[in-house]
A protein has these predicted regions:
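ABC-family P-loop ATPase nucleotide-binding domain
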Residues: 1-18, 231-248
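ABC family nucleotide-binding domain
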Residues: 7-215, 221-226
Length: 248
């Protein structure tokens, strides 16, 4: 008998991150409760400094909470030691950042296969997975190129492929189109829509309402807390309608 997978990809309870103390205490994330179902796309919006990027860093294991709980696929991760947390980042979480964070001295395929190699996969398996992902995101013809030879949209596609290298439970995207023009933004959002349709769980931090409109659920943050939550009921047709806004 097999054990059923947890319904939730991510859950937080009372998640808090503070900086400073006394009168200088800042609550970057303030007692946040969040649940993200498997296969769901959640967008988080809010003004600069509201805590949305800090929230992403906490749930992805890039930073430690001051208090509260984080469960990833039913596993409590806020209590993990540094070594276990580093392993989790390599295997269960994929990151897509605004600034790409590709290694310019490595080829495109070497960038994509790196997380799998670090997680202990064989070079042959890591390379095969990387090439399949590059084909999936439409830049397999750039496998041997350096990132500096790619356009912004192509580099972000490579970053998405790298984030998927270890088939993560959760992909976290922090302003993934912030450095892209409208055409490249449309390409990346179409890719996210394909990921959504394949059942990938996504949490996207963005300032762009059109990008947020492609999600299943929109959460608004202010001063470290959730102040509004809206379920977007348009389904696939609604998301594709939002994408059409980039074409006009």
């Amino acid at each position: 008998m097999t054990t059923a997978e947890p319904r939730l990809a991510l859950a937080t309870r009372g998640l808090t991150k503070t900086y400073g103390d006394g009168e200088s205490l800042v609550r970057a994330v303030d007692a946040v409760d969040l649940e993200v179902a498997r296969g769901e796309t959640v967008a988080v919006m809010g003004p600069s400094g509201c805590g949305k990027s800090t929230l992403l860093h906490l749930v992805g294991g890039l930073d430690r909470p001051s208090s509260g709980e984080i469960d990833l696929a039913g596993r409590r991760i806020d209590r993990l030691g540094e070594r276990a947390l580093a392993r989790l980042r390599r295997t269960d979480v994929g990151f897509v950042f605004q600034a790409f964070h590709l290694m310019d001295e490595l080829t495109v395929v070497e960038n994509v296969e790196l997380p799998a190699l670090l997680a202990g996969h064989s070079p042959r398996r890591a390379r095969a997975r990387a090439m399949a992902l590059l084909d999936r995101v439409g830049v397999e013809h750039k496998a041997g190129s350096l990132p500096t030879a790619l356009s912004g949209g192509q580099r972000q596609r490579v970053a998405v492929a790298r984030a998927l290298s270890n088939e993560p439970v959760l992909v976290l995207a922090d302003e993934p189109t912030g450095n892209l023009d409208s055409a490249a933004t449309l390409d990346v959002l179409r890719l996210f829509e394909e990921l959504h349709e394949s059942g990938q769980t996504l949490v996207i931090v963005t300032h762009d309402e059109r990008i947020a409109a492609t999600a299943d659920r929109l959460i608004t943050m202010r001063d470290g807390a959730f102040v509004d939550e809206t379920r977007l009921t348009g389904g696939t047709s609604g998301r594709l309608g939002a994408l059409a806004g980039f074409e006009s």
